[in-house]
Amino acid sequence: MSLNAEQKSEIVEQFRRSPSDTGSPEVQIALLSARIQHLTEHFSVHKQDHHSRQGLLKLVSQRRKLLDYLKRKDRGRYQDVIERLGIRK
């Protein structure tokens, strides 16, 4: 249904800024992107799952806010995250 602990730790490992980093915007955006990708695949099979679609919209909105924050604070890190995740802007 969701990401398991192994998948989360792999994502955190790829995007963290320091050895103990789990909450930086880059890590949060990467985790949200993985959940969004998982839900997108879910909707290819379950087209009528409107309740989960609402959750997807909330995740996309949350990711957008984090991306906007990162863009305001450090454009270089923002560009790096977008390129690494393949998010269009």
Curated annotation (Swiss-Prot):
The keyword Ribonucleoprotein applies. Residues 7-19 have a biased composition (Basic and acidic residues). Keywords: Ribonucleoprotein, Ribosomal protein, RNA-binding, rRNA-binding. InterPro entries: Ribosomal_uS15, Ribosomal_uS15_bac-type, uS15_NS1_RNA-bd_sf. Coiled coil: none annotated. GO terms for cellular component: cytosolic small ribosomal subunit. One of its GO terms (biological process) is translation. Pfam families: Ribosomal_S15 (PF00312). Residues 1-24 are annotated as: Disordered. Transmembrane segments: none annotated. GO terms for molecular function: rRNA binding; structural constituent of ribosome. The keyword Magnesium does not apply. Part of the 30S ribosomal subunit. Forms a bridge to the 50S subunit in the 70S ribosome, contacting the 23S rRNA. One of the primary rRNA binding proteins, it binds directly to 16S rRNA where it helps nucleate assembly of the platform of the 30S subunit by binding and bridging several RNA helices of the 16S rRNA. Belongs to the universal ribosomal protein uS15 family. PANTHER family: RIBOSOMAL PROTEIN S15, BACTERIAL AND ORGANELLAR, SMALL RIBOSOMAL SUBUNIT PROTEIN US15M. This is Small ribosomal subunit protein uS15. It comes from Halorhodospira halophila (strain DSM 244 / SL1). The gene is rpsO.
